């Protein structure tokens, strides 16, 4: 019997495997894919993500293979732009790093293995069953059936929900955001800025240009098809992507550029505020727990952080030899203390301001008010969990007052 079985070798699963194996636990890390493998994503590592990667002693390995960005540039639907430095708050790095998941996830996986985790690929897990002594993980691999037992399981299965539904953790399908991205080479006009744009994309939603080394870029668009906007939003992310790259700015940047590979779409689970995070002998991390920023769609940072939090909690469970449901519920409280208020504020910011009525006035006002600009940037990148005195009434009053 293993100490811990982790299902999913993305950032959350591999981070948990690293922290647990480093402390001497017997850790089995499973994934349905062979590595390295592509993973459709925006590829952005925010200052929050970089803080965990630095703690894992991986930042020096990632810097040479990524593209360091020092600023964020936001364009309104009308095309007005505002630029700000990344907030290096609470001792975090004042920059972001763009690293394709093909590279990032394999580095994280190998790092966990180096520190003692066992890894098995091509395992499609179909069941996780808890009992009084632990969990049994069952599934299939190319050699036939698969089975492993452990004292605790960590689910790091991303946006995929069938296994969580089979386990009884999700009673209904969560509402998801939708995104699509493609890689391009020989892109014009790239700089040290992460570019976010509300032009050409159904609101609430945005397009992005994330530079990569050697003139390449991850370019995509995401939409949030729910609430009042769900009545008129297109749910076709390919249409949103095509509309975004046909904006004047993108046409200029992509003139002569070469698309590498296909446009790939993906869902984003942002339901942390209502999502389950634990069950008997089981913890959920990252997107499996709905931990994707509801304003930006960023999830790598929260996957890494929750992977670390889960590992620390599992170590406490082993130290106390208490794997009871109330002790597992303490993990949920830790996540709520860490992320609940931030996710509420991000959801509120999206719902109040990322709409056709207010997005242009908001960007225009942010260009005039550096304090407002930095509040919004800090909220978007998970560095602030309050809107302070920003309200719709105040924004409209300032805008129409000139």
Task: State each model region's role.
Residues 13-14:
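N-terminal Rossmann-fold NAD(P) dinucleotide-binding loop
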Residues 229-313:
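FAD/FMN-dependent oxidoreductases across multiple families
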Residues 1-10:
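Beta1/beta-strand and adjacent pyrophosphate-binding region of the FAD-binding site
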Residues 50, 55-106:
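A conserved beta-strand/loop capping segment in the N-terminal third of enzymes
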Residues 111-254:
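Predominantly flavin-linked oxidoreductase catalytic cores and closely associated redox partners
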Residues 34-54:
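Conserved N-terminal glycine-rich FAD pyrophosphate-binding loop of Rossmann-like flavoproteins
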Residues 21-41:
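Glycine-rich FAD pyrophosphate-binding loop
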Residues 315-402:
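C-terminal helical "tail/cap" subdomain of flavin- and related membrane-associated enzymes
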């Amino acid at each position: 019997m293993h100490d811990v079985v982790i299902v999913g070798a993305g950032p959350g699963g591999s981070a948990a495997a690293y922290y647990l194996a480093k402390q001497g636990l017997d850790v089995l890390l499973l994934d349905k894919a062979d590595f390295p493998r592509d993973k459709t994503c925006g590829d952005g590592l925010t200052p929050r993500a970089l803080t965990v990667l630095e703690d894992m002693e991986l930042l020096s390995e990632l810097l040479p293979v990524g593209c360091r960005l020092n600023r964020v540039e936001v364009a309104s639907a009308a095309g007005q732009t505002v630029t700000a430095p990344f907030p290096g708050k609470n001792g975090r790095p004042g920059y972001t790093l763009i690293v394709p998941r093909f590279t990032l996830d394999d580095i994280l996986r190998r790092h966990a293995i180096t520190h003692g985790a066992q890894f098995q690929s091509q395992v499609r897990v179909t069941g996780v069953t808890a009992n009084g002594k632990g969990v049994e993980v069952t599934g299939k691999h190319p050699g036939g059936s698969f089975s492993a037992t452990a004292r605790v399981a960590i689910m790091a299965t991303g946006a995929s929900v069938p296994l969580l539904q089979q386990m009884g953790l999700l009673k209904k399908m969560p509402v998801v955001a939708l995104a699509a991205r493609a890689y391009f080479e020989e892109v014009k006009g790239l700089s040290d800025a992460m570019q976010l744009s509300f032009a050409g994309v159904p609101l609430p939603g945005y397009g992005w240009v994330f530079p990569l080394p050697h003139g390449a870029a991850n370019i995509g668009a995401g939409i949030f098809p729910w609430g009042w906007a769900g009545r008129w939003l297109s749910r076709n992310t390919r249409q949103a992507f095509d509309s975004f790259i046909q904006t004047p700015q993108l046409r200029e940047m992509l003139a002569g550029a070469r698309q590498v590979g296909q446009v790939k779409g993906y869902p984003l689970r942002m339901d942390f505020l209502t999502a389950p995070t634990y069950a008997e002998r089981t913890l959920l991390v990252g997107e499996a727990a709905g931990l994707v920023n509801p304003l930006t769609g960023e999830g790598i940072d929260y996957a890494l952080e929750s992977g670390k939090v889960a590992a620390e909690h599992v170590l406490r469970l082993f130290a106390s030899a208490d794997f009871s449901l109330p002790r597992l519920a303490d993990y949920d409280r830790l996540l709520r203390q860490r992320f609940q208020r931030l996710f509420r504020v991000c959801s509120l910011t999206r719902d109040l301001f990322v709409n056709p009525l207010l997005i242009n006035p908001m960007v225009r006002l942010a260009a005039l008010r550096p304090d407002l600009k930095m509040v919004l940037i800090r909220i978007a990148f998970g560095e602030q969990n309050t809107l302070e005195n920003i309200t719709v009434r105040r924004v409209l009053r300032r805008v129409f007052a000139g």
